[in-house]
């Protein structure tokens, strides 16, 4: 099968063996797999992995192999949570992540534990269903115990911030997206601010925008250290609530039910052989998600 592989000296498309069949694991023929910052970090060597490693973790497709006694059958349309639980796993932390610790979904086939697989509706495109992972990440902000009577905003711009806003709207929370580069932010106005870019500029804006004693929800993930305005953080007695993942099952249900629409966030579709152009485009911005399709 064809796969996009991180090797010792970079990334390349290779013809590799299909996943080895294992007890309790389902093989999925990948329909579409989305590219995110984690994939770029692996491709660029910022996140070190054991080479060779197949990249990718946001995907959906069709079941192509099931072990004996499986609740799934060949041909079922499915997606999967990309972090396989271990006894160290807490809210997705400490497990093995597809495309990092084990081979991922930038391939014609991927093998995952049946325990992380969920069915998707026929009405969903493979690209829309692949949003289940970022939707689960967006749902994590609900762990900050946000209330409808509170004033909140999302400081950032682009696809991730827009997705968080839409997810919160499904839960009855109207939270606008504010880009500090182009909009004036009301100082000390918000009960909570969701930071979703992990830059000094967005942290500075978040600290400025939140009221004394308010909450900043740290949603974004960065493998690089991020400078924050520490003195103001302390002086305003701001609480920082860091969140990782919400419910993957809830994420899939939001997409399956049609309560959440993401089709306009789907960007360019390309084959694995076009990986150089796809990676270059993704490094340039996050207004829409790039996809490999099979």
Model-identified regions with their sequence ranges:
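Glycine-rich beta-strand-centered segment in the early N-terminal region that forms part
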Residues: 19-33, 46-84, 121-124
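Cysteine-cluster motifs in flexible loop/terminal segments that predominantly coordinate metals
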Residues: 36, 81-109, 113-118
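Residue-level marker of beta-strand positions
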Residues: 58-60, 76-77, 109, 140, ...
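Mid-domain Rossmann-like dinucleotide-binding core that forms the NAD(H)/NADP(H) cofactor-binding site
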Residues: 122-187
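Short SAM/SAH-binding signature in class I
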Residues: 190-196, 289
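Glycine-rich phosphate-binding loop and adjacent beta-alpha segment
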Residues: 200-259, 294
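C-terminal hydrophobic helical "lid"/dimerization subdomain
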Residues: 249-294
